[in-house]
């Protein structure tokens, strides 16, 4: 088995590589076929996914069985001020990878986001819920999903949310750093979603790679909370002496609008390969207990 990992140096790509190199996961045993797979790593410096010819050549030269596309322009506010770039990376980049995969018959695992939804609602959203993004980021990611469907027959579109992990920048590290520096934080308390440990997502992507259970998946931490709730748990588990205060989205203005409610239901996982996603508080606690070891690595 050969896997082409696009975006291997990012938060999720690094977590996938960590599982494979360490030959273990916090969630359980990793299939031998995955551990013994040949992994071709690419990042923004070695593969420009906005260049169709370059993508086609890379895929054709390497002839992977599976392509995992973790590459994206994920700066939500940055997408508002750089809409053309967001479209090139999140939409055309996804299209290019899909076209290349179809040409050689490879499976494509494409990572997407909860921000393809409007935020209207109060119950977890299943994979067939109506999409209606409210930001440039969500719009371009949804276009990417549509291109994947249009141009690749063997696809897994995997939506995740509020991702954090041992590698790279994320909300958990930001809150810890700010908590140490300031001693008092204000965090939005009227947006709900699912904090997701990159370890959990990476583990399930690798499991999907071995199947032909194609389609759209939600893959997020179990349970929902607000960003304020999330921040409070980060401070609690870290032991940092910091006060966390709730504010509204109206009080904390950002260039890009965020969905008020984007909690996802992992229905497809439950009905196909099994849902081993941890409750978000449990996964966060394990992360907080272990993150220093990974930094030292």
Question: What residue spans do the PLM features occupy?
Answer:
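Glycine-rich Rossmann NAD(P)(H)-binding loop
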Residues: 187-192, 217-224, 272
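NAD(P)-dependent short-chain dehydrogenase/reductase
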Residues: 146-193, 199-200
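Amphipathic terminal alpha-helices
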Residues: 280-297
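NAD(P)H-binding glycine-rich loop region in Rossmannoid oxidoreductase-like domains
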Residues: 49-89
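Mid/C-terminal beta-alpha module of Rossmann-like enzyme folds, strongest
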Residues: 204, 211-255, 260, 267, ...
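NAD(P)-cofactor binding segment of oxidoreductase domains
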Residues: 81-109
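N-terminal Rossmann NAD(P)H-binding glycine-rich loop of SDR-like oxidoreductase domains
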Residues: 1-26
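Catalytic helix-loop patch of NAD(P)-dependent Rossmann-fold dehydrogenases
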Residues: 88, 92-96, 116-158, 163
């Amino acid at each position: 088995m050969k896997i082409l990992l696009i975006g291997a140096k990012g938060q999720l790509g690094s977590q996938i590589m960590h599982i494979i190199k360490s030959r273990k996961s916090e969630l359980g045993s990793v299939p031998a076929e995955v551990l013994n797979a040949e992994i071709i790593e690419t990042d923004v410096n070695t593969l420009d996914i906005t260049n169709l010819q370059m993508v086609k050549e890379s895929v054709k030269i390497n002839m992977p069985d599976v392509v995992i596309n973790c590459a994206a322009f994920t700066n939500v506010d940055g997408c508002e001020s750089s809409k053309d770039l967001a479209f090139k990376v999140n939409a055309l980049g996804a299209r290019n990878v899909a076209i290349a995969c179809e040409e050689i018959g490879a499976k494509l695992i494409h990572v997407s986001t909860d921000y393809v939804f409007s935020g209207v609602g109060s119950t977890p959203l299943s994979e067939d819920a109506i999409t209606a993004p409210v930001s440039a980021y969500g719009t371009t990611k949804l276009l990417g999903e549509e291109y994947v469907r249009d141009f690749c027959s063997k696809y897994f579109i995997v939506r995740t949310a509020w991702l954090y992990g041992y590698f790279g920048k994320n909300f958990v590290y930001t809150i810890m750093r700010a908590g140490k520096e300031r001693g008092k934080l204000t965090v939005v308390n009227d947006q709900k979603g699912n904090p997701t440990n990159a370890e959990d997502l990476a583990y399930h992507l690798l499991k999907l790679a071995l199947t032909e259970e194609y389609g759209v998946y939600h893959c997020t931490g179990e349970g929902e909370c607000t960003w304020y709730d999330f921040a409070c748990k980060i401070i609690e588990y870290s032991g940092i002496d910091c006060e966390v205060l709730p504010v509204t989205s109206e009080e904390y203005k950002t260039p890009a609008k965020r969905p008020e409610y984007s909690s996802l239901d992992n229905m497809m996982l439950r009905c196909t390969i099994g849902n081993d996603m941890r409750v978000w508080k449990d996964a966060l606690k394990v992360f907080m207990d272990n993150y220093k070891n990974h930094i030292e690595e």
